[in-house]
Structures are given as C-alpha cells and as structure tokens.
Swiss-Prot record:
Function: Together with the zinc finger protein ztf-16, plays a role in gonadogenesis, specifically in somatic gonad precursor cell development. This is possibly by regulating tra-1 gene expression.
Gene Ontology CC terms: nucleus
Natural source organism: Caenorhabditis elegans
Molecular function terms from GO: DNA-binding transcription factor activity; RNA polymerase II cis-regulatory region sequence-specific DNA binding; zinc ion binding
Gene: ehn-3
Official protein name in the record: Zinc finger protein ehn-3
Zinc finger residue ranges, C2H2-type: 2-24, 30-52, 59-84, 92-115, 208-230, 236-260
Knockout mutant characteristics: RNAi-mediated knockdown results in abnormal gonadal development in 10% of animals whereby gonads fail to divide or grow in size. This abnormality is enhanced in a tra-1 (e1099) mutant background and is accompanied by masculinization of gonadal tissues.
Biased composition (Acidic residues): 195-204
GO biological process terms, semicolon-separated: gonad development; positive regulation of gene expression; regulation of transcription by RNA polymerase II
Location within or outside the cell: Nucleus
Principal location listed in the UniProt entry: nucleus
Family of the protein in this entry: Belongs to the krueppel C2H2-type zinc-finger protein family.
Compositional bias annotation for Low complexity: 185-194
Gene3D superfamilies: Classic Zinc Finger (3.30.160.60)
Amino acid sequence: MEKCDICHQKFSNKTNLNRHKVMHSGKKKFECQFCRRPFFRNDRMKEHMMTHIKKGNTFECPITACNSKFNSFTSLQFHVDSEHIIRGSSPAKCKSCIKWFNSSHRLLLHFHTAHLDHTKFFSFKPAPILPKSTTSILNPIKNPDDFDRIFDFFKTEIAPLFPLHSTVSQAPLPQCSRSVKSAKELSPTPSTEIETPEEEELDGPESWYCDYCKIRFDDKVMWYLHSGLHSDDIPFKCSLCGSLCDGKYDFAAHLVYANHNF
C-alpha cells in the first residue's frame, strides 16, 4: 500500500498515489475544450466533456466492424450494452486505434473524447456550464417499478450514509452493498493488453460512481436509476418533482422523505 505524506490516505499503487497528490498541488492542468473549465485529473475532465458531447445528434458505435449510428447517446449506450458483450474475458477494440477495453463505459468515453472531430459530428455550440453541472445519463424515470426500487434502495442503503446535520467525513468513499443482479458479468482479472483505467483508485471489481453524491455502486442498474434522479441542468435538482436541494445530504434526505406521488 502507498500512503500520501500530506493527508495520509492510502492507495493500492503508486500511480493512484501520484494522481491523488496532484490535488494537493492546487494546479488544475486539464481543461475542457468546450467550456475551458479546469480539472485536477484527466479522467474527471473527460467525464465532464461527455456532458457537452451527449448534447450532439450523431453517435457512432465505437467497436471495430460495427457501423451502427444513432441520434442520441442513450440509444448508442443501449446498443453497446445489449448487442456487444464487453467484459474481461471478451474485451472490445476501439475502431480508431489499437486500444482494447473491458468496459463499455470506458470504451465510449475514450472514443468520444480521444478521436472524434466534435465540430463535425456535433452540430451545437456548448452553452456556459454551471459549477458541478452535468447531463444525466438517463431520461427522467417513468416506470413505477423503478420508483419503488430506487426509493427502497435509498431508504435502506443510501440514507444511513448521509446522516442529517453531519459534517463531511474524510473517510474512504462509502461503498453500496446492495446485492442486485448486475447488468452484465464482470471479470476481476482484466487482460494485460487492456488500457488501465485512470479513474480506478479502489481495489475490487469495476464499480459505478456518482460524482455528486460521492457514492460507488457495485451494480450498474442501481447506478443508472440513481443517475436519473439528478436533473440535467442542476445536479441537486430532483428530476422527479423539480425541488432544488442544498447539496448531497439534502438531496438524499429529499429522495427518502419527500412525498412523490405519480
């Protein structure tokens, strides 16, 4: 284990430690090419760039030998997850370079931020972005079964992680323990030929992360459902009723205790 000599946080390897120590320097050297917002880390900057890119109107499947095209990123994402089985035992190769990926999320992120000519593929002008704003992965949730599922999940798993009137903890990120059937199989042992993900700083299998609530999900479906609760324009605006919340604690409490009738 590697340990930061400034804040004493521990990391599984030196690469993750060095990436972490950049934040202590105060220098944000990675800049979004759309809105010029600076970031400490390249992977966080790429995730942010996708909030602009998803507003486009032409999306091509990034997998070699597949020529499918879509008019929304959500449709492309559904296509990749349902038509192409991407995991450790069957990685996919980017059609524009020699890199292989064992995660559809990482492949889509790589393809759209590393290769595309955005002025050609996306006919829009990026609007000024609000602090910490992003575009939700999903459209607002409409299935009643999904509502019941996500609210039950918040009450039993998420609410205890956000006690009211508490201060921000310096402890490691909370890990959701909900055991639900995963959207796809994952392999804990990726091929050595596959690009090492920059965003991974925790040991264990691939997880899905909410950048606003600071929660990692072991299950992709629950991450999808959770992401859909954040509004497109303002992260802590409830997509179900439009209520504005004051940060992640207020947002979690609102989802658990507010009366959402549909």
